[in-house]
Curated annotation (Swiss-Prot):
The keyword Lipoprotein does not apply. Expressed in kidney. It comes from Mus musculus (Mouse). Residues 211-293 form the PDZ domain. The modification Phosphoserine is found at S381, S383. InterPro entries: CNK1-3_SAM, CNK2/3_dom, CNKSR, CRIC_domain, PDZ, PDZ_sf, SAM, SAM/pointed_sf. This is Connector enhancer of kinase suppressor of ras 3.
Length: 555
């Protein structure tokens, strides 16, 4: 690469054409004055005023771009991670020494709220500039993969924010200087710790320039590079697309900085001007890249793939354990050597409650649909939520679909019964009871006999699968398998469980017009046999007396 100090006036004009759009009206003034490369690197605010660049904002944009050229021209062979840390430490020491010497002066008055002197502000600006130069290295590969350096980077950013806030805050000079001294002391400690703890040779290696040729680019294929522009005009490659010209070259890595495109320096340019320069020659591109040292971090290219969100697969059974053959071990080692894929943000499913898309079947609980057609199943992945659609179709069915279920063992497949939630009729006299099925009584009574396979267990499961639709409890015929006997006068009652009172009971089939009768064991019923017999014998006599009175009234 030709040094910037050797640029001709034409090269300076070509470089200024890629700067911000607001600076384009001044290009002809650079061309008129025939400013060369050496004059460009030494340009100042006063020189820009003479050129006709009167706006302060426009002057700052030009000077920032020139600073990048100065760093490229003078600091390429000297800038290392170690030197940048030392520069930051020296800047913090200079600011600390300035404040200490200023406080020793007899004319020092820290109880005033005047603006700090220019020397103080200049030292602060130099410190922040040194921190920015170090952060530019820490924010790029291979240093982003080191945990300790990532923590150091975050601390330096926070300290720089605290420093700028303290300087701009309207307060006493002594108070402001105390805050600045605290920040400076922490920065000194970070620099010392970084120098002591880091022994990798990459800290002492400088960046280098490498020229990359991308020939034979097919029309419409593209180069396959992902470029991110920083706020100050640096263009950093973040990754490459797999099997693209950039990926096939094996020379373009994430973290590389684009310096030239087709022999034209693009440092400080707008990103759109850089892209236009890349598309200038459709058959091929020549890039000049600035590469950070790799050292012992084994940094490899990082291709990017176009990934879509896919739901996690549900593993129904554990995979069979097989011994690895030498061929499979070799394939695994080859896969490890492939470039790692950069982490992409893959959007998760929507956070709102998901409602499956279905045009033919309605899964709502409003109507009493008796349709017995099999549920439709989608084929393929129509959307990221197609997995949720299929899952909802497996889970949702109405009571009318219970006849379609295949036979299975109730003991092994039925989930534990849970108490129903509060319903609108909660608290009314009508008791909330469960049906008189052996399956449900087996949960209430741990000594009950297990039920066998049959349709009755399936009906019970499907009838009470949902808390929202519970069919009327029907009377169940007496069976000799029941452990508990009932009196003759209570044959119209069915056996159930009262979850309100926490006991078992006999329930009439019509829950709306019956009361709950406490269930008693056989032993306890023997004691009350005489009382129940008296009550049963007393009922006919009471009826006869009422009939006799009715006859007397009719006469």
């Amino acid at each position: 690469m030709e040094p910037v100090t050797k640029w001709s006036p034409k090269q300076v004009v070509d470089w200024t054409r890629g700067l911000d759009d607001c600076l384009q009206p001044y290009v002809h003034k650079f061309e008129r004055e025939k400013i060369d490369g050496e004059q460009l690197l030494k340009i100042s605010h006063q020189d820009l005023e003479e050129l006709g660049v009167t706006r302060i904002g426009h002057q700052e944009l030009v000077l920032e771009a020139v600073d990048l050229l100065c760093a490229l021209n003078y600091g390429l062979e000297t800038d290392t991670m170690k030197n940048l840390v030392l520069k930051l430490r020296a800047s913090s020491h200079n600011l600390q020494n300035y404040i200490s010497s200023r406080r020793k002066s007899p004319a020092y008055d820290g109880n005033t709220s005047r603006k700090p002197p220019n020397e103080f502000l200049t030292s602060v600006v130099e410190l922040i500039g040194a921190a920015k130069a170090l952060l530019a290295w820490l924010d790029r590969a291979p240093f982003t993969g080191i945990t300790d350096l990532s923590v150091t980077k975050n601390k330096i950013i926070q300290l720089c924010l605290d420093l700028t806030t303290a300087v701009q805050k309207d307060c006493l000079i002594a108070e402001m200087e105390d805050k600045v001294l605290n920040v400076v002391k922490v920065l000194n400690g970070i620099c010392d710790k970084t120098m002591r703890s880091t022994t990798d040779p990459v800290m002492s290696q400088c960046a280098c320039l490498e020229e990359v040729h991308l020939p034979n680019v097919r029309p419409g294929e593209g180069l396959g590079m992902y470029i991110k522009s920083t706020y100050d005009g640096l263009h950093v490659i973040t990754g490459t697309t797999e099997n693209s010209p950039a990926d096939r070259s094996q020379k373009i890595h994430a973290g590389d900085e684009v310096i030239q495109v087709n022999r034209q320096t693009v440092v400080g340019w707008q990103l759109k001007n850089l892209v236009r320069k890349l598309r200038e020659n459709p058959t091929g591109v020549v890039l000049l890249l600035k590469k950070r040292p790799t050292g012992s971090f084994s940094f490899t290219p990082a291709p990017l793939k176009n990934l879509r969100w896919k739901p996690p697969l549900v593993q129904t059974s554990p995979p069979p354990t097989t011994t690895q053959s030498p061929e499979s071990t070799m394939d695994a080692s080859l896969k490890k050597e492939k470039p790692a894929i950069l982490d992409l943000y893959i959007p998760p499913p929507p956070a709102v409650p998901y409602s499956p898309r279905d045009e033919n079947v309605s899964f709502g609980y409003r109507g009493h649909s008796k349709s017995k057609q099999p549920l439709p199943v989608r084929k393929g992945s129509e959307s990221p939520n197609s997995f949720l659609d299929q899952e909802s179709q497996r889970r949702r069915f109405t009571i009318a679909d219970s006849d379609q279920l295949p036979g299975y063992s109730v003991e092994t497949n039925v989930l534990p019964t849970k108490m129903r939630g509060k319903t609108p009729s909660y608290g009314k006299p009508r008791p909330l009871s469960m049906p008189a099925d052996g399956n449900w009584m087996g949960i209430v009574d741990p000594f009950a006999k297990p039920r066998g396979n049959g349709r009755k267990g399936e009906d019970a499961l499907c009838r009470y699968f949902s808390n929202e639709r519970i069919t009327p409890i029907t009377e169940e015929s007496a069976s000799p398998m029941y452990r508990f006997s009932r009196p003759l006068t209570e044959r119209h009652l069915v056996r159930g469980a009262d979850y309100i009172r926490g006991s078992r009971c006999y329930i009439n089939s019509d829950l709306h017009s019956s009361a709950t009768i406490p269930f008693q064991e056989e032993g306890s019923k023997k004691k009350s046999a005489s009382s129940s017999a008296k009550a049963s014998s007393g009922e006919p006599s009471l009826l006869v007396s009422w009939l006799t009175r009715l006859k007397l009234l009719t006469h």
